[in-house]
């Protein structure tokens, strides 16, 4: 490296552990937080450093972790099998980093709250001190379960794990976060100096601090005032608590950007969701996936929206489920509407109570106000779909399309037996079962003629049984 140049950074993320306290058949690091795998949050923070390489050390259910994270070209994997501790895990990355120099930043796949600012602070402090190793520590009120930072004359001397700590060491409030920066040059040789003489019979990465001190390699610390960012996830309750923090952070970001969230504690908005200014979100709303909500819209209580695009000035009333749907400006949906994937709802269109859409286009100004199923349908502009209308799209083997052209009027309790087309401006009489195309401007009616039988009720009363 030329003088003054920052050495390259390499990130290693440990993600090999089983996570037995999760009591799960799935890899711990793949459990979702705000719609993304736990480890994906760590990866995003790692990428804020623009590292030369990112290596994920996998072990328990390694194939599943690889599959879940496939398609990320900057990510390489190293296998730890069997799992024999954190130092052993880091050693497995040596092959992937052979011939590399610079700074290695070590992260844990189950610590998703770490901020990019703290990570940058770690790297900057490490470079400024020309340290062999730099450890992120935190001051906590209840240090139980964490490795303690033992200092001599103010400098870090060693890290002692809870199981191996003396009563005096257990009283120490400064804990190890499991987040480190290392100079790569002495690292691999130092790792080979670690022994497994501890209560667990494992190779502890924390032993590196003592080894570095004995070898005269400077060890520095970056001390955090709280452990909020560095909390790990080892149980379902910890997963729930971290998820709550991530959701709270997301809600606060949206509110700071001009979104009204009436009750943030009961509002679930995933990490990938975007919401425009002056939109109002009521209690119990769930926004998932890559959903986008425009400006000045209103999403009422207990509605769930997944991977959908909601335009400006859209109203979604209570208890709707909207999946994979695009809704244009000024439209209204609900209450109790179910929009399955593949719909496009036009400007100022209306979908009312107990209406279900599937792979349907509803044109601008059209309305289906109540009690209808519209599937595999293309509906033009300014169409009225009466209550109880059903597009009968399935013949038992295949799905068929229904086309309703601009300005048509579909009377209540109508069945449209697909494939069928209702032409521009045509009317369909209420109660009809339409099996043939209705031409533009025509009236289509297909029902039995009404017959009134005079005096029938009185005669029925006189019939003796």
Which residues are covered by each model-predicted region?
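Glycine-rich N-terminal loop/short-helix segment of MobA-like nucleotidyltransferase
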Residues: 9-33, 49
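Conserved alpha/beta core of the MobA/IspD/sugar-nucleotide pyrophosphorylase nucleotidyltransferase superfamily
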Residues: 173-276
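Structural signal for interior beta-strand "rungs" in well-ordered beta-sheet cores
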Residues: 260-445, 450-451
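Short beta-strand segments
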Residues: 14-15, 57, 106-108, 136-139, ...
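Conserved beta-strand segments of alpha/beta enzyme cores
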Residues: 29, 74-76, 155, 218-220, ...
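Conserved core of the sugar-phosphate nucleotidyltransferase
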Residues: 63, 73, 114-199, 206-208, ...
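Residues that recognize and position ribonucleotide moieties
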Residues: 31, 112, 173, 180, ...
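Conserved N-terminal catalytic core of the sugar/cofactor nucleotidyltransferase
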Residues: 1-10, 36-124, 465
